[in-house]
């Protein structure tokens, strides 16, 4: 079972602090909209990059907006489950987990990149290390991100399984939490190989947070449905429509850059059945995660 954890919340006025319980008498039409973003990079960086989104939504929705970054994926699932946030930007698999525990959650948007609503996981290795191809991973440590991450755990682990490599049997599973932690650890030679979102990897290279000369690409996963934007099903219809419209009509590249996409399209729960199928390949019981 997922344990309740504290998570970080950040806003311009309050900074980082502990998140309290339900804050509004009217859950269906709260005075303030709390939006959670995944902790797939440093929280302070995410908060800083989210300020244009905050300003845009406050202008469109005519409500104060609080940007929240949880300490991990499980904390975000719990926050959505217990009504501590109204909108959540989940990873594909963390959304599937959240939906299994709170069926009223509604996906309403998905990022579009290069004309497609999907992305890939990239498997990388230390450039001068022992891993040159997938087969070389056998008998060695392999770094994943958060356990509930799609591109930094579920998808690459399923890819390795299809290649005959089973975690903790054929290689040692190492979880480092965040995508950037995986890239840095592999670049430094602390682990010989690992996996993360290809989109995040590109950003880390472009911003010179990792040196591509120290890394080797060994594989890409099959396309994965992109991160879904979700909201609480109990919100009043007028507010849900306004939230949906605000995101689907987003055109500002400075805001879309936060999501690493060029546009946001409509999404449905059925779009994520491929993740449920992937979990079956790995013999994961979603209800018990």
Put a short name on every predicted segment:
Residues 35-59, 70, 93, 117-183, ...:
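Bilobed "Venus flytrap"/periplasmic-binding protein-like clamshell domains
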Residues 78-136:
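Acidic, polar ligand-binding/catalytic clefts
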Residues 1-15:
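N-terminal secretory signal peptides and thylakoid transit peptides that target proteins
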Residues 27-52, 224-226, 230-289:
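An extracytoplasmic/periplasmic, membrane-proximal ligand-sensing/linker region
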Residues 105-115, 171-172, 205-223:
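Short beta-strand->loop
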Residues 92-102, 161-162, 187, 192-212:
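A ligand-binding cleft/hinge motif common to bilobed small-molecule-binding domains
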Residues 74-88, 101-102, 135, 179-199:
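Short helices/loops that flank or line small-molecule/ion binding pockets
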């Amino acid at each position: 079972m997922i344990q309740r954890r504290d998570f970080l919340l950040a806003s311009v006025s309050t900074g980082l602090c502990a998140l309290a319980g339900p804050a509004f008498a009217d859950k269906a039409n709260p005075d303030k909209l709390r939006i959670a973003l995944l902790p797939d990079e440093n929280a302070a960086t995410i908060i800083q990059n989210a300020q244009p989104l905050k300003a845009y939504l406050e202008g469109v929705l005519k409500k104060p907006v609080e940007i929240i970054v949880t300490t991990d994926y499980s904390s975000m699932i719990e926050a959505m489950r217990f009504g501590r946030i109204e909108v959540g930007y989940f990873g594909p698999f963390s959304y599937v987990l959240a939906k299994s525990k709170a069926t009223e959650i509604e996906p309403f948007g998905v990022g579009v990149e290069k004309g497609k609503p999907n992305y890939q996981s990239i498997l990388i290795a230390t450039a001068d290390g022992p891993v040159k191809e997938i087969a070389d991973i056998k008998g060695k440590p392999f770094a994943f991100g958060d356990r509930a991450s799609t591109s930094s755990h579920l998808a690459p682990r399923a890819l390795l399984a299809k290649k005959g490599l089973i975690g903790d049997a054929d290689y040692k599973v190492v979880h480092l939490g965040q995508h950037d932690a995986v890239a840095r650890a592999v670049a430094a030679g602390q682990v010989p190989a690992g996996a993360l979102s290809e989109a995040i990897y590109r950003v880390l290279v472009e911003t010179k947070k990792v040196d591509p000369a120290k890394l080797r690409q060994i594989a890409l996963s099959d396309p994965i449905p992109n991160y879904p934007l979700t909201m609480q099903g109990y919100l009043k219809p007028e507010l849900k429509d306004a939230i949906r419209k605000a995101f689907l009509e987003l055109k500002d590249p400075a805001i879309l850059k936060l999501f690493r996409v060029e546009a946001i399209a409509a999404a449905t729960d059925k779009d994520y059945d491929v993740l449920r199928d992937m979990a079956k390949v790995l013999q994961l019981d979603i209800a018990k995660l």
